[in-house]
């Protein structure tokens, strides 16, 4: 990568200004609200990803299916601001914030309206752009006493200071609850409590490709104390908003990316699942026994989550199919749950194995992620076989998904879908999404695929039952999934350390704007918990919106 060293004023507008920089780069500096500034770096006047699915137009709950035009700021209200310029620097001041841009060498500084600095770029070379790749880096100063929070589902202490954390999605079964990274979310939001001033702010990088936050792990003597966000692809396009209190930052992030979907009341009650139940040869009888045991022991069971075993033949899973040997009468079983007042949530996966009965039909629709030969599905390893992932930036895939969910699950009496295994771990550089008519590397859109899968599930449920508040769950995704779904900390492991550290992960997720969350009570992987561990985990689970015992 190469640093951007110098800038000059190119144009002014009612919201801010544009800088002309080295190597045909430009930087747009705009004030969207008195306490919200946006910085967008363009190469050759263009952005790499022309649309955003994380930031709706101002006042809208959601983006269009094909995303919002990234550079369109027209929905934001007019902001009263003052622009001043000298040969050495530019100043943009609102009633809440003052942004100063030093032009040579390039550096930005953010302060309150009274002049109190709360955030600054690194003194030397804060902006880097890849010359042979689409990578970039943004480095900011670390100050004594800084505290860092957020970044999604991160393990370990709540304060992330001193760590290097990846913004990426992985199927992290059995992760280390104190040190494991990454988990399931790509969440490039950092909440900073500035040490010297005590002022808190958030900085959100609206970028989907994989990246990382270095929050003081790296040290280079020539550059002083610094932290940075870097990504292997995409756009350096960030929103910086001042609290100024710590508790003010998360609501402002949600005002930007969309508020939490209001869940139905039943989803807040106790739920039960176990992977082994749906995998058992007599699965229907065993699952019916859950209803009977709950009644016998007076356990107020609100929901049962079906593991993917209802679709299994041997170790393989076939989405939107039923294994009628294990479930000879699935509709009758759903009626039993309904009569007991228990809702049913069924596991669904975005990949079709190549021997799935509908694989050829879906391939003929062009609804899979494509490989080097654009017309051919890209195959990858998935659940003891090879398969292809659905491309939710293709309307054909969305239609097929919603038809399958409606006919094969909702039509059988299932109440909701549980979007699982949606990290889109395809590591072929030539993997390509349809991009709603603009073919796009999958590397730019992994979190978007999980987000749109979840949206497709939610909207199919709403169409089937328009008078009921929809509910769905997703394991993976990026900022915006809170508009549709509940989520959780994934496939944890039985042990006191998981109970301890998952609580901190949950607090970090909540600070990141993921409010409807929880953890697998008792641990998903590992041995059976001892009685005290299970009791303590259940007591903690009562205090979470997702109150689910899973193994």
Feature-to-residue mapping (PLM):
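N-terminal accessory segment at the very beginning of proteins
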Residues: 1-267, 271-275, 282-292, 306, ...
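Aromatic- and carboxylate-enriched substrate-binding clefts and catalytic-loop regions
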Residues: 61, 65-68, 302-551
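Generic secretory/membrane-interface signal
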Residues: 96, 153, 165, 229-231, ...
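Acidic (Asp/Glu)-rich catalytic clusters
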Residues: 258-261, 295-298, 506-511
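A generic structural motif
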Residues: 274-278, 521-523
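Short, acidic/polar
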Residues: 280-296, 398-407, 503
């Amino acid at each position: 990568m190469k640093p951007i060293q110098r800038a000059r004023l190119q144009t002014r507008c009612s919201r801010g200004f544009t800088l002309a920089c080295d190597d045909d780069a430009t930087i747009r500096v705009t004030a969207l609200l008195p306490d919200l500034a946006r910085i967008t770096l363009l190469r050759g006047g263009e952005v790499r990803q022309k649309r955003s699915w994380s930031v709706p137009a101002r006042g809208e709950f959601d983006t269009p299916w094909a995303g919002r035009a990234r550079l369109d700021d027209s929905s934001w209200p007019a902001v009263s601001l003052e622009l001043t310029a000298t040969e050495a620097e530019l100043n943009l001041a609102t009633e809440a914030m003052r942004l100063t841009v030093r032009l040579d060498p390039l550096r930005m500084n953010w302060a309150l309206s009274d002049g109190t600095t709360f955030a600054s770029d690194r003194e030397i070379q804060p902006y880097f752009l890849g010359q042979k790749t689409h990578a970039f880096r943004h480095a900011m100063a670390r100050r004594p006493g800084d505290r860092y929070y957020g970044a999604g589902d991160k393990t370990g202490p709540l304060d992330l200071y001193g760590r290097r954390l990846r913004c990426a999605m992985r199927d992290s079964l059995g992760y280390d609850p104190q040190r494991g990274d990454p988990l399931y979310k790509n969440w490039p939001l950092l909440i900073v409590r500035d040490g010297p001033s005590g002022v808190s702010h958030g900085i959100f990088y609206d970028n989907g490709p994989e990246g990382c936050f270095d929050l003081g792990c790296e040290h280079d003597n020539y550059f002083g104390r610094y932290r940075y966000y870097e990504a292997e692809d995409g756009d350096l396009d960030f929103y910086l908003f001042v609290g100024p209190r710590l508790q003010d930052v998360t609501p402002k992030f949600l005002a930007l990316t969309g508020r939490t979907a209001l869940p139905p009341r039943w989803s807040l009650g106790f739920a039960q699942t176990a992977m082994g139940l749906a995998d058992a040869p007599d699965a229907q009888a065993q699952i019916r026994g859950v209803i009977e045991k709950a009644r016998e022991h007076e356990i107020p069971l609100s929901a049962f989550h079906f593991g993917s075993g209802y679709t299994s033949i041997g170790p393989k899973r076939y989405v939107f199919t039923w294994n009628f040997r294990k479930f000879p009468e699935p509709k009758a079983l759903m009626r039993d749950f309904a009569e007991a007042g228990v809702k049913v949530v069924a596991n669904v996966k975005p990949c079709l194995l190549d021997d799935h009965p509908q694989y050829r039909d879906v391939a003929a629709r062009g609804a899979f992620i494509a490989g080097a030969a654009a017309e051919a599905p890209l195959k990858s390893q998935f659940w003891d076989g090879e398969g292809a992932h659905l491309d939710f930036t293709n309307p054909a895939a969305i239609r097929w998904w919603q038809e399958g969910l409606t006919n094969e699950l909702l039509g059988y009496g299932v109440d909701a879908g549980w979007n699982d295994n949606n990290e889109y771990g395809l590591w072929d550089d030539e993997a390509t999404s349809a991009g709603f008519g603009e073919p796009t590397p999958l590397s730019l859109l992994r979190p978007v695929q999980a987000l749109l899968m979840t949206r497709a599930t939610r909207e199919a449920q709403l169409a089937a039952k328009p008078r009921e508040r929809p509910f769905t769950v997703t394991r993976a995704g990026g900022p915006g999934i809170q508009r549709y779904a509940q989520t959780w900390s994934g496939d944890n492991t039985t042990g006191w350390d998981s109970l301890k550290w998952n609580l901190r992960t949950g607090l970090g997720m909540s600070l990141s704007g993921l409010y409807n969350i929880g953890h697998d009570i008792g641990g998903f992987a590992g041995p059976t918990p001892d009685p005290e561990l299970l009791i303590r985990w259940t007591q903690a689970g009562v205090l979470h919106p997702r109150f689910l015992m899973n193994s």
